[in-house]
Amino acid sequence: MLTIATLHVALQVFGAFSPSHAAAVTLEHRSARDGNSVAVPANWDVYGYLFNVTVGSPPQNITMLSDMTWMAPFVRSGRCLGQFNPELCVAQGQSFFNEHNSTTFANTTFAQATWPVTAFAPNFTVDYGRDKFCIGEICNKDTLMQVSDFPYPGSVVPVIPFGGIFGLAPTPEAITATSEPVNFQAWKNGKMGPLVGWHTCEVLKSAATCQGGDAQLVFGGTDTTMYSAKKLQSYEIQNPEWLSDAFYPSTPPRSNYWSTSLTGMWIRTDKLSKNYAVPFKAVKTAKRTPPLAVVDEGSEGLGAPLSLNGYKYLVRHIKSAKLASKAIVQNIQQQGSSGYNTADQDWYTVACDGLHEYPDLVYQLDGRKKYTISAGDYVTKLTDMPGSVCYLNINVWKYGRTENGDARVVLLGRAFLKRKYLVLNFEDRSFGLAPLRTG
């Protein structure tokens, strides 16, 4: 989930996984010096994938939201309005980290930071502290983390089913301590390797490889039973200066997303459409540049990515496509199966059968490998409607649009990732994709 996206969701009850469910799997390491690995299951919630860690001494269980665009770890605390007062600062039912119950917690001299707009709370204000942070059995002492200190009582913030955010964004080229994810800090201290492996079990016959969850994260390595290393295509991240202001102005500017150039985006019927990955001028004085594709495993990127112009072309080439009624649009939004910040686009219903006749969506990253999303992964059934009602689950992302209907940024989310194994490499600042073994 992009850190400053606007969410309007109904809260759901989440059965958190215990850290004891972390398991040993067949893992890949870059070298023996890189340290250990641990695999943990994650469960899907309307906000994204959630999993458990422990923080402090003695350990406190904290359910974390996985976020590949967040940086240093964040925990809800008993602080607000510049004071420690859990009764005032934490709403009833909200989980949080109680620093006063940890013998190893320490404040730091890093300046307090505030983000005026976020998905979770306005004027999102944090202090910085250090404490022991464990993923499964792998622990890193003195992990630097964001500790909430909102400028209002806890009752202002809705109760959410997690007590922290586990940032998985790559570190910027100019690394600062406050931009380092938990696993990066642990890798620097020799506790684990520099890789993070990720896959979802959505298209698999069972959830065994996700330890009964919806997805599995491997910290410090990858699960080599789920992909062939020979088929892994890696991409060095590309974070041009204009990307930092593409969504929301940020000070200092952000330059750390898992992103690469999108050099091809086609709709394939009996032939390929024109290429909808249209180069554009990011700034008036610059040369034309290809749009970017940003990896986002969370609730922003659920649908298959297209530009508005590409979406219109797709609709024209599906005979059963009809503009959805207001009632159906409401059901789409309530079901939570499509990305947020798509409110400006039209929605279309389509026939639920004959998907093999629908077009494929084809993408090319950085002038190299091409990837395909078939109709079975971009046509979604509405579960709370009588009869069989399906719709085009396409993400024309609000913040990636250009005025003429092209896209400057698309999100590689669930529809794109569900049949792939994803490798995040924090040492090389690259990400890799390989076909997910489904047998």
Curated annotation (Swiss-Prot):
Q: What SUPFAM superfamilies does this protein's entry cite?
A: Acid proteases
One GO BP:
proteolysis
Return the EC number: 3.4.23.-
Q: Which residues are glycosylated?
A: 52, 61, 101, 107, 123
Name of the featured protein: Secreted aspartic protease FUS4
Q: Species lineage, top-down?
A: Eukaryota, Fungi, Dikarya, Ascomycota, Pezizomycotina
Q: Where are the transmembrane segments?
A: none
InterPro entries reported for this sequence: Aspartic_peptidase_A1, Pepsin-like_dom, PEPTIDASE_A1, Peptidase_aspartic_dom_sf
Per the record, the gene is FUS4
